Amino acid sequence: MVKLNSNPGEKGAKPPSVEDGFQTVPLITPLEVNHLQLAAPEKVIVKTRTEYQPEQRNKGKFRVPKIAEFTVTILVSLALAFLACIVFLVVYKAFTYDHSCPEGFVYKHKRCIPASLDAYYSSQDPSSRSRFYTVISHYSVAKQSTARAIGPWLSAAAVIHEPKPPKTQGH
């Protein structure tokens, strides 16, 4: 601890007493120039370009990669190839998934077609294949136009057989 009310400039003060447990320490000491700067070295070594020339000669040559870097590159590329194969397999399976058709329909040529049409045209001659596709396309167009004309809440018979309003005589 530092004893308060002591002046470090007083040289003739009484010596510090150990009895009271305080030490008289000057809070500010004068600075000496020798302690501010380090002594300059006697010998300075300056590295020149000639020391680095052996490294520059090897700089232009092909550097063989380290084995650890090479194996990591191979492992990363194999992992990416494996993931790409899995993605392609999932996409392929999603597009070629065996679709289920309602009862009375058969899945053929990526479409659900009525089983009666399939049985009829499969018993025909081989040239009937083009007619088969024509019937399918007409069937799907007719199905779409019927679905647009009739709402799902109305029956087909109610739309066709609507009662006509009675004609009034006069105008």
UniProtKB/Swiss-Prot annotation:
Taxonomy, superkingdom: Eukaryota
Listed A to Z, the keywords are: Cell projection, Cytoplasmic vesicle, Endosome, Golgi apparatus, Lysosome, Membrane, Signal-anchor, Transmembrane, Transmembrane helix
Q: Which GO terms describe its biological process?
A: clathrin coat assembly; regulation of postsynaptic membrane neurotransmitter receptor levels
Listed Pfam families? Calcyon
Disulfide bond entries: none
Q: Name one GO cellular component term.
A: early endosome
| Protein topology in the membrane | Single-pass type II membrane protein
Q: Does the keyword Membrane apply?
A: yes
Family (UniProt): Belongs to the NSG family.
Q: What is this protein called?
A: Neuronal vesicle trafficking-associated protein 2
Q: Which organism is it from?
A: Mus musculus (Mouse)
